[in-house]
A protein has these predicted regions:
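Sequence signature of WD/YWTD-type beta-propeller architectures
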Residues: 2-3, 12, 18-331
Length: 331
């Protein structure tokens, strides 16, 4: 079994503490953190009013998410729900694993995710086929791997890799079957997502001291920063309409922001006061799913909400006694 330096472990926790509910009972300190919580604050800064967009149709498709089915033990599973809130069900069955970062394939037939094995103490990437529930482990001790996402053409998976002996997140690619692993760019980079045409990758990095978003071509060329945020966290998305959505803010003051893919037009879009985070666009680019605490401001209060891309028509999608978070929208 690998033994990791204490400093390495601490750095991994710091970099991955972007999205987990706080105060998870008896949680292993090396596990992913996804929705940090703290004391809500009452003072907020006004934001520009988003432009009014044409009304879209009702949301369609399905949203995969992390669900704390066993609240007290905090054993995270992967669940899925229809875009109208119906059909909520658990997908994963391995109670010895803790599951995170689900993402629906572009064809809607499968879900990829990262899972932590409490026995081997490693994160691996899996793919689960929705029709058969057949699950395949795609990686094997290549480091601690998370945030997998399938390319628009369905052939490639981008993901974050933490080396086993160095707490440095990097962005990698592999073929759909888990072979042909290669690094995109030799930089600190986490929470990657694809451009609509699959030619570029959006990711978060602190290469310039503060965490910001960057875009790079799949071949590692043309690296550039997009947007400028004071407290960027990580999990972002890039829509079919060429908009980028992300979240920024200190604990319990996080809000969603959208901008054009060149970084222009940056503005807050989430209703104030929900501690909103982890956004994901609908396939048509007209809606956003995200995690928030609008209705229950406490450690197990995070639920999945959706809204239109201009921040209107807020709807609560899940309603459970445990946390639902890390949504990713698919067809």
């Amino acid at each position: 079994m690998y033994k990791r330096p204490l400093l390495c472990i601490v750095l991994v926790i710091f970099m991955l503490a972007c999205n987990l509910p706080s105060h998870a009972p008896n949680s292993n300190p090396r596990l992913l953190a996804t929705l940090q919580a703290s004391t809500p604050l009452a003072v907020f800064t006004a934001a520009p009013v988003p432009p009014v967009l044409p009304a879209s149709t009702e949301p369609t498709g399905r949203i995969a998410l992390t669900c704390q089915i066993f609240k007290e033990e905090s054993k995270e599973q992967i669940c899925i729900v229809n875009a109208d809130g119906s059909g909520y069900r658990r997908l994963t069955t391995g109670d010895e694993l803790r599951h995170y970062y689900a993402s629906v394939a572009p064809d809607g037939q499968s879900v990829v995710y990262s899972a932590y094995n409490t026995q081997t103490e490693h994160f691996e990437i899996y793919e689960l086929h929705l029709l058969t529930n057949e699950t395949k482990m795609l990686t094997n001790h290549f480091g601690d791997l998370n945030a997998p996402e399938i390319s628009p053409d369905g052939k490639t998976i981008v993901f974050t890799r933490y080396y086993l002996d160095v707490a440095k997140p990097t962005t990698w690619l592999m073929d759909r079957d888990g072979t042909n692993l290669r690094q995109v760019v030799d930089l600190v980079a986490w929470d990657p997502t694809w451009s609509p045409d699959g030619s570029a990758i959006l990711f978060a990095s602190d290469m310039k001291q503060t965490s910001q978003l960057f875009i790079v071509n799949v071949d590692g060329t043309d690296l550039r920063q997009v947007g400028d945020f004071p407290f960027l966290r990580g999990r972002s998305d890039w829509s079919s309409q060429n908009l980028i959505v992300t979240y920024s803010g200190i604990r319990w003051e996080r809000e969603l922001y959208s901008m054009n893919s060149d970084g222009s037009g940056q503005q807050r879009i989430s209703p104030i006061g929900g501690n909103s985070q982890g956004p994901s666009f609908s396939p048509d680019g007209q809606w956003i799913a995200f995690t928030s605490y609008f209705d229950r401001y406490e450690v197990h209060g995070c639920e999945i909400y959706i809204m239109r891309v201009d921040g209107t028509d807020l709807r609560r999608l899940t309603d459970n006694e445990y946390c639902d978070y890390q949504p990713r929208w698919g067809p």
